[in-house]
Every structure is written in C-alpha cells, then in structure tokens.
C-alpha cells in the first residue's frame, strides 16, 4: 500500500473508496454538499457518530467514488490518536474488495499532524495483514493499493516516511509468532537474524552450544537439555554511521516451544499455543528490521536472543536441580515451567557485557501479568524512572498499551532457596513482580534496565483494531520509537 496526502479536498476527491469520519452529533454539512441527500440517509439510519456506527453506500454515480463509508468517531473530547488508528483500521477493512485508492478524512483538529498521519497509515496497512503461508491455495485478496489522507497539512507528510519500516518490522514479528514450532526453531530464528544482517548491513554472532558451555551459561543451557534441537544465542548489532552517543541492548525471550518440561502444561495452560513463547524474540527481531531501515544516528543497538525449546526426555532438567548462571549465581529449579527467566538470566548477563547504557527485555513471562492487565496492556518493570518514562512515551506514540508495575524489593525474599542462591519462582501472589526481580539480579551494576512482560499482548484470539486475530507483533513499535525518536 502506498501512502500520501491528498492534493484535493473532500469536495473534489474522486478515488475508488471514500471514508469520512464524523464525530458524535457532528453535522454532516461537508458530506451533504458533496453528496446531496446523504444527510437524510444518515437520519434514516439514526446515525449519531458513535464509535460503533458505520454507514456504507455503493455506487454514487459516474462522478463519485465507487463506495462511500461514513464512520462514527465518538465524542470530540475523546477522539485521539488511538481513535485515528481504530478509524483507519475500520476504513481499510471497509475498502476491502477494491484495488484502487482509498481516501480517508477524519477529524484531525487538535491532533499533531505528523503523528496523526503515521497513526492512520500504520493502522490501515496492519489491519489488512493476513498470513496465508501455510494454506494449499491462498485466498485471493483485493485490497486498496493507495491510501490518501484528506485534510491534513503538507507538514504531515513527514509522518509517512517511516510507515513502511515500522510495518515491515511488525509484520516480521507477526510471521514469526504465528508460525508453528516445527518451522520456527532456534536455528530458524538464527537464520532470520542472518537474513537481516545480509539485507541491512548488520553484524551477527551466533553462539552454539559449545560456545555457551565455555561461557558457563548453565541457566540457559539447562532449559535446552530435553530438546533434540540445539540452542542458539543470537547477537545482532546495528552500528550507526558517525559517533556513537548511546548504546542499548534489546533482549528477547526465545522459547520456540514450551511444553513446561516435567512441570508439564495442562488444562488452561494451552500447551498447543506455546509456539508464541518466542514472542519476545520476534519483537526484538522485528524492531531490528525497523531500526535497520530507519538508520537512527548516534545509537548502537545490540539484540540478544537466547533461543531453545523446553521439552522432555531422559536428559531434561528436573524439578529440584541446581544450575549455575554465567556469573556464578546458583539457581534451584522448583518449577521447570518457569524456564524463560533462566534463559533470560544468561542473556541479560551477556547483554551487560556489551556495556550498554540501557537494557530492555521483552518476554512472554508470566500468566500473573495477564491476570493483572489483560490482553491489551503489557507490564513494565524498571530500575530507572527515566527509562520507564521514555518507554511509556514510546508505547503511547505507537499505540501499544503499557503499564508500569512495582518492583518491590522486599518480594525478593520469596526467591530465597535453602540450598542455592535463588529459586526460579517465588510464591503465587505477586508472581510477575518476583519474576522481574529475578531478572534484575542479572543486569550489570549501573545499567538502566526495563522488563516488559508481553504474555497477554503477544496474541489476540479475536482480533482488535489494527490487529487481526492471531499474532499482534506487539513491542516492535514501542522499541523502534524509543530508539529512533529518543527525544
């Protein structure tokens, strides 16, 4: 899909599908002037401009668009960038079946034009995403080839420049999360990183099992013991032209399948969906795709993924085993289904060795976070208020729900082991907090760190807004915004 600002106004636009948004109780004066009789049609349908309302009219004559769609936008005082995204996603879906141009006019007043243009274009493209890779005969899809935004000033065009890069990263993350575990393996994630390196001039190092053993990564490696697939620690680097003013590390959980190990997932644990336990790695790989295309100046980005499967065989780690992380910390495993934090422990230690100013990890880590925040908000824990604020702003700008959670030090008592330095899980209450506290231990001194738990947001069963049902690609927009727009 191509994106542009329309050079004509509503009265003169003559593309294929025209979508116009009306605020609640807003008179349809401009529409009535262009399409006489439309006001009566809206009145007949008792159209009030509520967010759920939509009126579609086909065949408006020889001189008009083939389809007109009027969307309700809700109250004026509640219409914001999230409203733009929702309306643009609805507009794109309403234009399905037409391969020409889609014109979109919303209520842009009070919105920053550049941000509004970016929000609308990203939502329109992402809402039409469909994954048909695994079908014998993919269904033909007719979609608009171009989106023209009507009524925005010329300065808004700057917001369209990064849309393709952002959406490409989100779509890569969606593809990785949605693919089955016999397709997306640790080796496949490493190959995805290799392809990014080849296509975008990035640097890649992949540590094999022997390399990880030499580094003493016992926490990571113990998780992989039950699998026939070799683990991979993937290190992808973006280096900017010119001076490096800051260095950051993105760490993603990369469990390509999680059976739970001997603490086998049963019942509501949805073992059949545990292909998405590598959602953190998908997010950071997708972010690297976007970052590599946008080429931010002055920032060096290290992406680290410790990838493996958590399976069961005669060599699998037992409940009660004690393992040693790369820094010598000993961990008593009281739950083999709390494996993600073990892989992240060694990944965070490795990330800290790169001497970053900040480390951000993303992981489908705890069901407790889903209970607390649902499936539209990810949880954020951080040891640094400035970093937490920057990530919150980046998430807000990208339309991704993020909520800061407490990092209460006293809860760390629940991780104490009688035999080792730590247990890998604490008591049930506050489980997402103790998980974050466990990770914090493995971050180097003086490094700003944040942990984002995406267990609820990585997948949408029914779809919502610009996210179709399935993998959402959550986290890519937040990370890309944080790194590329540091101000």
UniProtKB/Swiss-Prot annotation:
- Cofactor requirement: Mn(2+)
EC top class, as a word: hydrolase
Family listed? Belongs to the peptidase M17 family.
Q: Which GO terms describe its molecular function?
A: manganese ion binding; metalloaminopeptidase activity
**For binding Mn(2+) 2, which residues are annotated in this chain's numbering?**
253, 258, 277, 339
Q: According to its UniProt entry, what is the function of this protein?
A: Presumably involved in the processing and regular turnover of intracellular proteins. Catalyzes the removal of unsubstituted N-terminal amino acids from various peptides.
Q: Which domain of life is it from?
A: Bacteria
Q: Spell out the GO cellular component terms annotated for this protein, sorted alphabetically and separated by semicolons.
A: cytoplasm
Protein name (record): Probable cytosol aminopeptidase
Record has Manganese as a keyword: yes
List the active site.
265, 341
User: Which Gene Ontology terms describe the biological processes this protein takes part in?
Assistant: proteolysis
Q: Name one Pfam family in it.
A: Peptidase_M17_N
Kindly list the places in or outside the cell where this protein is found, as annotated in its UniProt entry: Cytoplasm
Keyword Cell membrane assigned to the entry: answer is no
How many cofactor units bind, and how?
Binds 2 manganese ions per subunit.
Gene that this polypeptide is encoded by: pepA
């Amino acid at each position: 899909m191509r994106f542009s600002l329309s050079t004509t106004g509503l009265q003169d636009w003559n593309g294929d599908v025209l979508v116009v948004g009306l605020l609640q109780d807003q008179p349809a004066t401009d529409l009535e002037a262009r399409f006489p009789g439309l006001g009566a049609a809206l009145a007949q349908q008792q159209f009030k401009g509520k967010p759920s309302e939509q009126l579609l009219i086909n065949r408006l004559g020889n001189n008009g668009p083939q389809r007109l769609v009027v969307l309700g936008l809700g109250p004026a005082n509640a219409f914001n960038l999230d409203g733009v995204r929702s309306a643009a996603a609805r507009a794109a879906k309403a234009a399905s079946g037409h391969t020409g141009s889609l014109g979109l006019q919303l209520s842009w007043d009070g919105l920053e034009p550049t941000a509004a243009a970016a929000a609308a274009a990203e939502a329109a493209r992402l809402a039409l995403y469909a994954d048909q890779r695994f079908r014998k005969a993919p269904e033909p899809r007719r979609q608009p080839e171009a989106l023209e935004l009507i009524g925005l000033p010329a300065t808004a065009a700057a917001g369209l420049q990064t849309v393709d890069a952002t959406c490409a990263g989100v779509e890569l993350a969606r593809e990785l999360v949605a693919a089955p575990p016999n397709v997306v393996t640790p080796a496949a994630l490493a190959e995805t990183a290799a392809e990014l390196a080849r296509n975008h001039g990035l640097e890649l190092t992949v540590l094999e099992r022997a390399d990880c053993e030499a580094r003493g990564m016992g926490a990571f490696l113990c998780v992989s013991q039950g699998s026939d697939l070799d683990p991979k620690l993937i290190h992808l680097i973006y280096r900017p032209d010119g001076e490096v003013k800051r260095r950051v590390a993105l760490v993603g959980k990369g469990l390509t399948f999680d059976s739970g190990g001997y603490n086998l997932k049963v019942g509501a644990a949805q073992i059949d969906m545990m292909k998405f336990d590598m959602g953190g790695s998908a997010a950071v790989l997708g972010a690297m795709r976007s970052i590599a295309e946008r080429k931010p100046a002055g920032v060096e980005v290290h992406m680290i993924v410790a990838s493996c499967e958590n399976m069961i065989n005669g060599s699998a780690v037992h409940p009660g085993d004690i393992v040693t992380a790369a820094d010598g910390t000993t961990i008593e495993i009281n739950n083999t289904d709390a494996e993600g934090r073990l892989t992240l422990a060694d990944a965070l230690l490795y990330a800290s060795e790169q001497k970053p100013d900040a480390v951000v990890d993303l992981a489908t880590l705890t069901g407790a976070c889903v209970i607390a925040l649902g499936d539209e908000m990810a949880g954020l824990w951080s040891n640094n208020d400035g970093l937490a604020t920057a990530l919150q702003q980046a998430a807000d700008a990208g339309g991704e729900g993020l909520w800061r959670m407490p990092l209460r030090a006293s809860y760390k008592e629940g991780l104490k082991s009688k035999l080792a330095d730590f247990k890998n899980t604490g008591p049930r209450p506050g489980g997402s907090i103790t998980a974050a506290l466990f990770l914090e231990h493995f971050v180097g001194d003086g490094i700003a760190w944040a942990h984002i738990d995406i267990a609820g947001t990585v997948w949408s069963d029914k779809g919502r807004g610009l996210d179709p049902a399935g993998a959402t690609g959550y986290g890519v927009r937040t990370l890309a915004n944080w790194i590329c727009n540091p101000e």
